[in-house]
Amino acid sequence: MNPTAQRIHELTDLLNRYAYEYYTLDAPSIPDAEYDRLFRELEALERNHPELKLPDSPTQRVGGEPLAGFAEVRHEVPMLSLTNAFSPQDENGVFDHAEMYAFDQRVRDGLDGGNPEYVIEPKFDGLAISLLYRDGVLVQAATRGDGTTGEDVTRNVKTVSNIPLRLHGENVPELIEVRGEVLMLKADFAGLNKRQAENGQKPFANPRNAAAGSLRQLDSRITAQRKLHFFPYSIARQQGGFEAEEHIQELAYFQELGFSLPNGNFGCFKNIGEVLAFYEHMQQKRPELPYEIDGMVVKVNSLAQQRELGFISRAPRWAVAHKFPAEEALTIVEAIDVQIGRTGAVTPVARLQPVFVGGVTVTNATLHNQDEVSRKDVRVGDTVVVRRAGDVIPEVVRVIFERRPMQETAVAVSDGIGHQQDDLFAETPSAKQTESVPLHKPYRLPARCPICRSEIEREEGEAVARCSGGMLCQAQRAQGLIHFASRKAMDIDGLGEKQIEQLVAQDLVRHFADLYRIDIPTLQKMKETADKGSSENENGDAETVSGDLSKYNTQNGKKQPTKWAQNILAGIESGKTPELARFLFALGIRHVGERTAKTLAQAFGTLERVRRAPEPVLACLPDIGTVVARSIAHFFAQAEQQAMIDELLAAGVAPQAQAVSLPAAQYAGPQRWITRLPGFKISENKAQALWELAGQSIEGLQNDKALPADWQAWRSKAQNTALLENLKTFFAQMPSEDEAAQGSDGINKAVAGKTFVLTGTLPTFKRDQAQALIEAAGGKVSGSVSKKTDYVVAGEAAGSKLEKANALGVSVLSEAELLTLLC
């Protein structure tokens, strides 16, 4: 073997092993940068010597040129379906497992009274595929199709990171056909839909549709970008290798061969009672899983017993798909009205006849926006399918048009010579006819906000309509103030939703800064008015109206506020020095969540720099695309928003500056921000060339008359001239590289880059406070424990996360030890 071929073999083996460690074991042994370096070396060698490329080369995971179509594949062993079993819940949440007990009895009868063990595993909501390996190398992948014939999706499947291109271990068979499910993890689905929205493309309805659509792309490069995942669940045929006697052994064999398993979410049990207990446990755990499942699959564990039981029609007797309670149900739309959010978003909401679905009674369901209402043609009186998945807001999925209420209406009928039914001069009157038409008209959003009567507007290209009233709208004002004071924003202790709603309803608070002008008389007035409204309420439900503002002392016949009022004022005062990220999040800038607010704080360090940041610079930052950057820049460009911030500063609010750990100047190099200038399309290479032609200065971009004509035409527009001047001023006032480095030195090197998980109740800090301390020191906080976790900080009543940390050998810290590390 020549040196080049040998090096290609070495790199292929190395990179496949590293990918297995990363995607399957969750325990990478080399840094990402080293993997990337080796990958690029292999790419270069294969590009120069394509004849030496190996069938299991990891470079195949990036996809290739588009196909004209998919070839058909006939399954040697048919891909059969499973019989379904259901366990409906009553309104108390109690399951009726009659169908599963019947399944267990059928199995026992088929085994002449034998006592079967069962394996129970997730029923993934994805796309079934079959993987064929010969001598350990993946040679073919096919979809289920009709069970007999599927489609060849080999090229696309090779882009799925956790599918081994070559099998691992000592017991690699000569041939094995692995059946399993391709799916998209919830986090990857959310990321995909975010990118779809930013690119102006239609989002996917659910992870299953996204996975199916991604796997069947003719262009495998698109599939490679979609981050699909695979879990195996059965062996269709096998020659050589380890011969399992039980299904649970097959699952262990999959792991040995290099496949991922849904660890912790399957098990082997002695009887049906234990199986059903695990099913109920998984139904509760379902919303927390990283992937979608719609039930559990129960299989007889013994492969010999499986063969003895055999098949009926197109399904095995030894397995059943135990579906979770229906998360869809039928009900009737009683009314449609709208809700106004804090950004003015107008959301149509269906008011429903109460229906029990997904474990709760649902009375309202979102209709999202006018386009969705029109597309589904939802009307008052319609019978509709309502879906609720996990903690997702219930939504109307579709209308059952056959049940739509109709009415008869008269129609004019011609007599054949041009006269209509109501024509007084007709010689021969026509017979009266009627036609059946819907009782209710199609729904349309109101022209004006039902709260403030401001016009409802919808910008071109936007799906969501918005109330134009801004903070003049009581609904927006209340929601905006609730968000501003919330725990993850300004964290004003003692000031809850009900108090804010009362303050807004009584016009005592109109703007954020008004919160810092509240005094005892204001709170007294609010309480007295709330009490009056309570006493006039037909139900006399004072607690509902006034919330927790209900306690007064009486001295000399005069009402005195008790501790609740002082607590509110103390909470307002103590919240005047928030972290910069919290303050930015509290402002309620459209598209700016906690993560984006943290990015802005880490990139600029001070509020003043964030306020002045130009849109092209913002668009260069990590996880901030053009849509979000435009929204941030638009917010700070509005005089009323700048005035609102100035009012807050004048009221004593002082957002804390922080060390710059993501220096904006490093991310926003000239070749990057030039490509993000609005209305000017250019590649990064050409942007770099333009920058060099301009003498590597913004002044040159502004004034050099030798620059290309398209650039000169762009800069001649007034708004672009102003933008370039803004960019010049902004970069001139940004900290130098030395200053940025000094800021980075403030990061705790013992914590920087480390991943922490918080669990249990800490003795002193709330979790948000502990998270803020860790992030300020340069660390990261994750919600789950893995081999990548550096520290678990455990308080009282720490549960499964602490157990997993101990099992994985992850360092466990107390709050005191965390503080020592941070110092």
Curated annotation (Swiss-Prot):
Residues 746-823 form the BRCT domain. NAD(+) binds at D32, A33, E34, Y35, D36, S81, L82, E121, R144, E181, K299, K323. Its EC number is 6.5.1.2. DNA ligase that catalyzes the formation of phosphodiester linkages between 5'-phosphoryl and 3'-hydroxyl groups in double-stranded DNA using NAD as a coenzyme and as the energy source for the reaction. It is essential for DNA replication and repair of damaged DNA. Pfam families: BRCT (PF00533), DNA_ligase_aden (PF01653), DNA_ligase_OB (PF03120), DNA_ligase_ZBD (PF03119), HHH_2 (PF12826), Nlig-Ia (PF22745). This is DNA ligase. It is an enzyme of class 6 (ligase). The keyword DNA damage applies. Its cofactor is Mg(2+); Mn(2+). GO terms for biological process: DNA repair; DNA replication. One of its GO terms (cellular component) is cytosol. It comes from the Bacteria. Belongs to the NAD-dependent DNA ligase family. LigA subfamily. The keyword NAD applies. Keywords: DNA damage, DNA repair, DNA replication, Ligase, Magnesium, Manganese, Metal-binding, NAD, Zinc. The gene is ligA. The active site is at K123. It catalyses: NAD(+) + (deoxyribonucleotide)n-3'-hydroxyl + 5'-phospho-(deoxyribonucleotide)m = (deoxyribonucleotide)n+m + AMP + beta-nicotinamide D-nucleotide. Residues 528-558 are annotated as: Disordered. GO terms for molecular function: DNA ligase (NAD+) activity; metal ion binding. Zn(2+) binds at C449, C452, C467, C473. It comes from Neisseria gonorrhoeae (strain NCCP11945).
